[in-house]
From Swiss-Prot:
Keywords: Ribonucleoprotein, Ribosomal protein. One of its GO terms (molecular function) is structural constituent of ribosome. It holds the Pfam family Ribosomal_S9. It comes from Desulfosudis oleivorans (strain DSM 6200 / JCM 39069 / Hxd3). The keyword Ribosomal protein applies. GO terms for biological process: translation. It comes from the Bacteria. Belongs to the universal ribosomal protein uS9 family. GO terms for cellular component: cytosolic small ribosomal subunit. This is Small ribosomal subunit protein uS9.
Length: 130
């Protein structure tokens, strides 16, 4: 009998992470390669593994993540969100830990749009009095 594979989707900024998890040795793959090869910055690696560390399941599950869009930080946040959603469904005690750390909340902060008549979202064109 094949081990049960769990699935969840995580989002952050413009990144979308489809996450599959099954009992295993703690191997994490992102887009077909090792997580440390995909996430080049140490901060992104830490963000991605945070939910597994807090619930003490880092060595208990194999995680496969397919992530599209966004940058490195957005992709790491999306991966963490997806992993957290799976772990929350497994055990109510884990859900409490994840919720207390804010890992189950979809981070709604996205880039503010550029407005017409302005240089950027908030920046104005230089004003000349005379």
């Amino acid at each position: 009998m094949e081990a049960q594979t769990l699935y969840a989707t995580g989002k952050r900024k413009t990144a979308i992470a489809r996450t599959w998890m099954k009992p295993g040795s703690g191997k994490i793959t992102v887009n077909g390669k090792d997580a440390d090869a995909h996430f080049t910055t140490n901060a992104a690696r830490i963000i991605m593994r945070e939910s597994l560390k807090i619930t003490e399941t880092l060595e208990s599950y194999d995680v496969d993540i397919r992530v599209i869009g966004g940058g490195i930080t957005g992709q790491a946040g999306a991966a963490r969100h997806g992993i957290s959603k799976i772990l929350a469904g497994l055990d109510p005690e884990m859900r409490q830990k994840l919720k207390a750390n804010g890992f189950l909340t979809r981070d709604a902060r996205v880039k503010e749009r550029k407005k017409y008549g302005q240089r950027g979202a908030r920046a104005r064109y230089q004003f000349s009095k005379r």
